[in-house]
């Protein structure tokens, strides 16, 4: 109703951009005739104009003013370098991002290309732009691919990868535009704030940031803080004993009600992801461990038992984690990707290692932490793009102050979303999924099946193998994950069947008929791998492993093997082309050395050859000619195949379970029907699915009994669909509340973190260190006076002897100070007198230290301040964690836990800063530098 009265606010926003789009289109005619050098000169002219403005605030209006011309320049560069021209809707997307909003753009609408517009414009200020992606592979792909546009226009492009050294990171952060993952950016920020010297700092001040898949980073990952930790030793046998106790305890069939314990030793709340022992369970556990009390502070067991129970019932192998090389590796529940190097905290990971009988690694202590929410709010201007943001619009607005604008598609969507089919049991559902996959496959259409876990993807794989349907499997298992982009490149071919866990292939488009570009690159990689890549790097198979009907996995082709099965490519290459490739391999061995490259170096060279950027390198030119030749032969077949697939109905996407978030369901649907292609989607569900079981409640249980139908009969009911949507909304609200709570609690820490980090940075920069330390001393003198002097009593009754003794504890150089010298002084006079004494003593101390070596006093000041900040901040983080655990119980006493946390946390912070100041003053006066040794003649 409001929309009818006021009009659609999104349409109003889009209308505002239309005149600017017209301006850019008019400028296109002027820019088209310019030479490459003249186009590059535009960048220098823009930079000059912005440099004269000075501050960022003054530069903003100039950026808005030059936007049409800058966008027209990028559009022309895109055509020349990539052979891609920005559509009008992509220009609108660029403007939305430049204004610091979220642009919702559907799959296949070229989000990656859109990011080149605002990143170029904002990089002209010289203050750096960060383009953020969800994984290292996408960051590298975008830096190589889209980075060509920026490099062509004279800007420097940096890339941050997981295994880079600090000096490489600094060099890349100093580029005009830097591509990185969210976790690398966050961890570098934390490491910079733990640096012992300014030369170790790698990042510069933040300015502008564009996040690709913004919902994945700012919402899905917002519950997980970034933590840098150090190891602390805890007894390993406790984890092992707790795991044995957990196995012996029996789970209650249902939750207890009204304070009455259920039958069983412990209850599991899947919704809250918690386990609670019953009275009987406590008694049993204490008896098995031979202890009186699980909560005994001298020998605590409760924490270990709770973690062991959670490991047993809530952390499922091949769903939440996989076991690989003797380690439990976390699987990201949203993307289905493994996250090596990440560990659950508070001893939970150790409990899982004990459950799986793996070596137990040391527990960790937090040294520094920040949530993504507070990290990305450090950018003065933040923008993001995704295919699905509207469902989370409120959260983006409230938490990040980010508006969402839906950018229209370039072509009308032709996808059909078929109604859900709900089955009574899971077995019936999986049979139906397999049958529909077979039917669609036989019609010559490609099928993509999204599953929610590794285990489910393998179950479906077995069902399809029974029916002799060849298919590719894409899940978190290591043998599949490395083939991700290759499998997705094949997924649009006629009759292709791909099973993917949580659509891990976001980032690579599914192109109908197959992606001939990618297949040509794959062919070259296969031909060159054995000749050019170091032998130890050769273990990765160059082609996706395809699961065959009868034989399970095919043999992994080795680098030196003959070309892989032809079924991976659209056609067999002609003899001429095969000979050309063999000759190319021989020539490149002469030029680049026999097996002298790393795999990444080879891939980068093939990627460069596959694009259109100008190059003078004859080897890259030869590689480019060969790639074009292979692509040409593949194209002839792929184009026909694409036509067949289109006529058959395009890609069919099957969802096998509703995800907790509607957004993730929409992302899966969005794989079909990209850029106006035909396509269809359908979800198959069962009444035993997690979402309905955990959040659907008793209502769904009632429905199960009401439907007296055969197992293999699908149920289609409006009431059921509403129950599903209601359950999803309930889950989204539940997780939103958790994220909001994480954010509110971290907001308290954030204010403290900023104060500590800015103090630390001042010290690292070496700005006025002496003044800072004297300031600490003056405040310490004031605190001593306030502690030992009661202003309500007359001065003659003050305990000046105690006061003077305390001052001498901190400043031994004032050993001649006597109580008589301070008698008769008022409170303010006393403070001023002691401050003056401290300053004199500090000058004497400085003279003594500087005699040993000039500049030593400044080094000592920096060392002691950093040492105290780091030690006390680490202890403070532990104390704040403990406080957060305990304040929750105060809700029972009608007190707001958050307000209690804020108040007590603030008091603890003030106490920490006071201790830091006092410790620095004490350390500075006690500092006795060793005399330089005389060299013996």
UniProtKB/Swiss-Prot annotation:
Keyword Ribosomal protein: no
Localization per Swiss-Prot or TrEMBL: Cell inner membrane; Cellular thylakoid membrane; Cytoplasm
GO biological process, one term: intracellular protein transmembrane transport
Catalytic reaction equation(s): ATP + H2O + cellular proteinSide 1 = ADP + phosphate + cellular proteinSide 2
Subunit details: Monomer and homodimer. Part of the essential Sec protein translocation apparatus which comprises SecA, SecYEG and auxiliary proteins SecDF. Other proteins may also be involved.
EC primary class: translocase
Name of the protein described by the UniProt record: Protein translocase subunit SecA
GO cellular component: cell envelope Sec protein transport complex; cytosol; plasma membrane-derived thylakoid membrane
NCBIfam families xref list: secA (TIGR00963)
Record-stated family: Belongs to the SecA family.
Keywords, ordered alphabetically: ATP-binding, Cell inner membrane, Cell membrane, Cytoplasm, Membrane, Nucleotide-binding, Protein transport, Thylakoid, Translocase, Translocation, Transport
Organism: Parasynechococcus marenigrum (strain WH8102)
GO molecular function annotation: ATP binding; protein-exporting ATPase activity
Membrane-related topology note: Peripheral membrane protein
Chief localisation class: membrane
Function: Part of the Sec protein translocase complex. Interacts with the SecYEG preprotein conducting channel. Has a central role in coupling the hydrolysis of ATP to the transfer of proteins into and across the cell membrane, serving as an ATP-driven molecular motor driving the stepwise translocation of polypeptide chains across the membrane. Probably participates in protein translocation into and across both the cytoplasmic and thylakoid membranes in cyanobacterial cells.
Enzyme Commission (EC) number: 7.4.2.8
Superkingdom: Bacteria
Binding site for ATP: 90, 108-112, 509
